[in-house]
Each structure stands twice: as C-alpha cells, then as structure tokens.
Amino acid sequence: MATLKEKLIAPVADDETAVPNNKITVVGVGQVGMACAISILGKSLADELALVDVLEDKLKGEMMDLQHGSLFLQTPKIVADKDYSVTANSKIVVVTAGVRQQEGESRLNLVQRNVNVFKFIIPQIVKYSPDCTIIVVSNPVDILTYVTWKLSGLPKHRVIGSGCNLDSARFRYLMAEKLGIHPSSCHGWILGEHGDSSVAVWSGVNVAGVSLQELNPEMGTDNDSENWKEVHKMVVDSAYEVIKLKGYTNWAIGLSVADLIESMLKNLSRIHPVSTMVKGMYGIENEVFLSLPCILNARGLTSVINQKLKDDEVAQLRKSADTLWDIQKDLKDL
C-alpha cells in the first residue's frame, strides 16, 4: 500500500544523500555560539548548519528552537550532536567553546585551561572536515588561534581568528556617530591584539577619501582638543561595559563572524582585520597571531595588506607580539 508521501510525490532523480555545498559548524552553543548561528541563518549563508556542545539538553533545545523557525529561513538542514561526526564535510567551522575566566585568574591559567579543551575539539573537527577553514572566536582569541593552528596541522591560510573585525566595527560605529554618517562610509582600522592593547591606525582614518588626520593633525594624540583618542578607549572599554550591563557580549560578535563567513563562502575577496600568523612582518620574529588587514575569499585568508604604519604603531604591534609570546612559550602539550 502506497504511503501518503508516495501518493503525493513522484521522484524524478535517484534519492542519493547529497553532500552539502556550504555546510557551517558552530562549536559551542553559549551566547556567542548562538548569536553566530542566528547571524549565519539570517544571511542564508549555509545549506546545512551543525551545532556541537558537551551540554546535550541545551544543545538539543537550541537545535529544536532554530528548526522551529525553518519557515522563516533558507537553511534546509539544521542538526546538532555532541558527537563530531555531525560536523562532517563542513566548509567552515566556528569555534566559540572554551572555559570562562574566573575572578582573579591569570590569563596564562585561563589559556592553559582552554588549551586542554581545544586539545579535544580541534582534532575532532579536522578528522571530519579535513578541508575546512576554522574561525576561532573564543578568547583570548589571538593565542587560541595560534593553539588551533598548532593542534590542527592546517595551513595558516585556513586558521583565522575573529581578531579585530569587531573592534574595527565598533571603532567605525563610534566615529560615524560623532560625524552623523553611516559606519560603512567611515573607514578606519583597529589592528594588533584583540582587546586591551589593540592599535588604532589614525593615519588611515578617512571619509570619502578625505584623511581626517590631515584635517586635524593632532587626531589620536593627547594634544587633540576634540579628544578623538577617547573613541579608541571606548572601543577597548566597550566589551567590559556591555558585560557589566548584561553579563556577556554576543550580538555584535555574532554579526561580525557571519560577515567573515560571507566573504569566504561568496568568494568576495573583501579585506577584514582578522588574526593571522604575523611572523616575519613588522620585525616580529615569533609565531604569534595578530590582526592585520587580510583578504578573505573561497580559499580562506589568502593575502595580507601591507599597511603603512607609523613607528609608534609598529612599536605597539611588536609589544603585543612580545606579550602574546610570553604566554605562548609556556603553554604545555602543544
């Protein structure tokens, strides 16, 4: 007796299980992971979205909640499991998992605890998706991108840290607010280490090709009567402020990660400030990852833009590199 489905649908092609073309995996379904997931779904970037976490009930609940929104999305398959086989054939894997910093905990201790988590996660990702590109979002992102590169054995153009993509977006938003224009028309770059020691490249800030530093030569210095330097300070402080107010940050980083994925899956060759291996650049001698303007396309992170930096900016980059290396050199089991 034919089933209702058989009566309704007459097959034309053989029912072979198709390998997805644009599968994306998000590891970690906390606030950041789910913000990445919803941003990816909202931009219709994936034909399959996989979620992985160790908390099975939370994981299943998040999967079901997203699946129930399928009518309003263009992603036909949303799956989740604690077993990494669910991630097989991913084009891009976003890593948001990791342990949180405890009160009074040193960064080195936090990093070492996250290394121990990544030692389980990263080999599993590579086992099931050997051709993927990994985007690391977990903090401290520059060090954990290095850790991921070491543990994965992937070439450096396929291990990317979300880095200063969000810092630069915050910078452009805050400057654009002061000027009364849209952030996309206000160009400026935050480079280096994501977070406290990031570098604002004031010399490159422009609107419609007009250098703002030419209009105000003191811009970004302590002698600036308009105190533009405060904008960079606000960028650095903004995560702390949001965390103080709501407990975590998630929406902006989620949107920022989807932005990076779009450049890769659509082969756009757009330029983003993301964390990449900078050994040999700007006189940096160690294997550290810092944000520089990078071209992202279907092959991953294919090139780095040689930004003309001033001496003090280069000095700041090198200082960041030294700080990161001081922590990395003492990491165990890499």
Swiss-Prot record:
Pathway: Fermentation; pyruvate fermentation to lactate; (S)-lactate from pyruvate: step 1/1. The modification N6-acetyllysine is found at residues 7, 58, 119, 329. It is found in: Cytoplasm; Mitochondrion inner membrane. Pfam families: Ldh_1_C (PF02866), Ldh_1_N (PF00056). CDD domains: LDH_1. It catalyses: (S)-lactate + NAD(+) = pyruvate + NADH + H(+). GO terms for molecular function: identical protein binding; kinase binding; L-lactate dehydrogenase activity; lactate dehydrogenase activity; NAD binding. The keyword Lyase does not apply. One of its GO terms (biological process) is lactate metabolic process. The active site is at 194 (proton acceptor). Keywords: Acetylation, Cytoplasm, Membrane, Mitochondrion, Mitochondrion inner membrane, NAD, Oxidoreductase, Phosphoprotein. The modification Phosphotyrosine is found at residue 240. One of its GO terms (cellular component) is oxidoreductase complex. The modification N-acetylalanine is found at residue 2. It is a peripheral membrane protein. InterPro entries: L-lactate/malate_DH, L-lactate_DH, L-lactate_DH_AS, Lactate/malate_DH_C, Lactate/malate_DH_N, Lactate_DH/Glyco_Ohase_4_C, NAD(P)-bd_dom_sf. It comes from the Eukaryota. NAD(+) binds at residues 30-58, 100, 139. The keyword Isomerase does not apply. Substrate binds at residues 107, 139, 170, 249. PANTHER family: L-2-HYDROXYCARBOXYLATE DEHYDROGENASE (NAD(P)(+)), L-LACTATE DEHYDROGENASE B CHAIN. Homotetramer. Interacts with PTEN upstream reading frame protein MP31; the interaction leads to inhibition of mitochondrial lactate dehydrogenase activity, preventing conversion of lactate to pyruvate in mitochondria. Belongs to the LDH/MDH superfamily. LDH family. Interconverts simultaneously and stereospecifically pyruvate and lactate with concomitant interconversion of NADH and NAD(+). This is L-lactate dehydrogenase B chain. It comes from Rattus norvegicus. The gene is Ldhb.
